[in-house]
Amino acid sequence: MENREDLNSILPYLPLVIRSSSLYWPPRVVEALKAMSEGPSHSQVDSGEVLRQAIFDMRRSLSFSTLEPSASNGYAFLFDELIDEKESKRWFDEIIPALASLLLQFPSLLEVHFQNADNIVSGIKTGLRLLNSQQAGIVFLSQELIGALLACSFFCLFPDDNRGAKHLPVINFDHLFASLYISYSQSQESKIRCIMHYFERFCSCVPIGIVSFERKITAAPDADFWSKSDVSLCAFKVHSFGLIEDQPDNALEVDFANKYLGGGSLSRGCVQEEIRFMINPELIAGMLFLPRMDDNEAIEIVGAERFSCYTGYASSFRFAGEYIDKKAMDPFKRRRTRIVAIDALCTPKMRHFKDICLLREINKALCGFLNCSKAWEHQNIFMDEGDNEIQLVRNGRDSGLLRTETTASHRTPLNDVEMNREKPANNLIRDFYVEGVDNEDHEDDGVATGNWGCGVFGGDPELKATIQWLAASQTRRPFISYYTFGVEALRNLDQVTKWILSHKWTVGDLWNMMLEYSAQRLYKQTSVGFFSWLLPSLATTNKAIQPP
């Protein structure tokens, strides 16, 4: 165990110690967890106030810094004042002991994870590790192990002093509870209720599936690549109502992400990304080991189970009870839910119309939407002697789209049969785990998305819709399902996309038109929205949304 590179990379961010090839909790933490596992008659943990003290004592045993008083007070506020006495008693009689028992198993769950990590896919690293920026790779975690990780977060048992230096998001729940105490809101309480419901479901029946977390990287194409693209535009489905997570098409679902995965999920945030992390809490596990995304990176998560229903958005968000996820499993026991996190530029204002910003956004979407099965279908694979990369080339030239490290030996070009024996690693892993199985299951997946980078991020909805359409088309996605959420600026989206498709425009055609429009906006030569500029015959002219 001590010689495992993956374990050594993540161990500084875990509350465990390693001795004689085994993982352990410190003795005093074991004592506290054992007492809690036997119920309040042994541990005396029968209120939020006592739970707060138990968390304080365990963190002190781990030599961690003291939590802010507001965080500790948040636990007491929730369990002693907000929820009713019957629910509170159930938590201290049943859920807290079950979570403590789960944490006692945490070291052995991790050991089993690392024992199995090298056998999931031949030649591919899948063990829990820090996936640093510009380090493409994938991690497979069992839902049971994820439950233990989130239990650590609930009890604030992850070391947090060293996370900032690695640009890692927060992972403990202290800020979540502090926000509840400092400035109570029903939406914040509902976020916590989603997580409570997850733990209640987990403790009643431990799930047996797998969730994968992948950092994807592309070498970003330049503007000339996009201008000259002759790829046809994919189909475009407009939905004025409905939610991305309810899409029926088995499409890739877009998380309008912060560059720090999860954004404000574990603090006060309550918009699209944060809501998704509350109703699919297993997504939070990625915040442990995935540092912030660079401009050429995306994070794809496959298999996260949904546990909660909800209503509302932002301040009106409310927990609405149980959700039973009926998604089928793939050959790796992952639910067929694929979520990709891509972060847009924040408050771009007029910068949004500059070529460099448009290029940044389209390449970010390209990385997120890349469907490896389609990429391989149209490419040949070469391995260069003496370097550590697989390169995708098309028509004998480097496409500039993808590069990634591999653990396979360097050799001459691989044919399709050889490719099944020597699997490509990291960001080209997806869809190539099992020859003819995962490929076929996902080769026709579209993209389900919406107003990415708009709202609080300040992006232009018409340009952002166009950018995502271009990226989806370039990556050979068969369609986009676009959820407008009733945004007025997109009322003509269906009409415009149908007109463009009827004229058989290519990716390059639409990209060049968008560049021309953006230049006119920058130089104040037009004040109308992109769609009205493109189609002056629209019944009602869209006045351009003025950047704040």
From Swiss-Prot:
Catalytic reaction annotation: [(1''->2')-ADP-alpha-D-ribose](n) + H2O = [(1''->2')-ADP-alpha-D-ribose](n-1) + ADP-D-ribose
GO molecular function (one): poly(ADP-ribose) glycohydrolase activity
Top-level division of the source organism's lineage: Eukaryota
Gene Ontology BP term (one): response to oxidative stress
EC number: 3.2.1.143
Keywords: Biological rhythms, Hydrolase
Uppermost EC category: hydrolase
InterPro entries hit by this protein: PARG_cat_C (IPR046372), PARG_helical (IPR048362), Poly_GlycHdrlase (IPR007724)
Disulfide bonds: none
Coiled coil: none
Family annotation (Pfam families): PARG_cat_C, PARG_cat_N
Repeat recorded as keyword: no
Family affiliation: Belongs to the poly(ADP-ribose) glycohydrolase family.
Record's function text: Poly(ADP-ribose) synthesized after DNA damage is only present transiently and is rapidly degraded by poly(ADP-ribose) glycohydrolase. Involved in establishing period length of the circadian oscillator. May regulate post-translational poly(ADP-ribosyl)ation of an oscillator component.
Record's protein name: Poly(ADP-ribose) glycohydrolase 1
Lineage of the species this protein comes from: Eukaryota, Viridiplantae, Streptophyta, Embryophyta, Tracheophyta
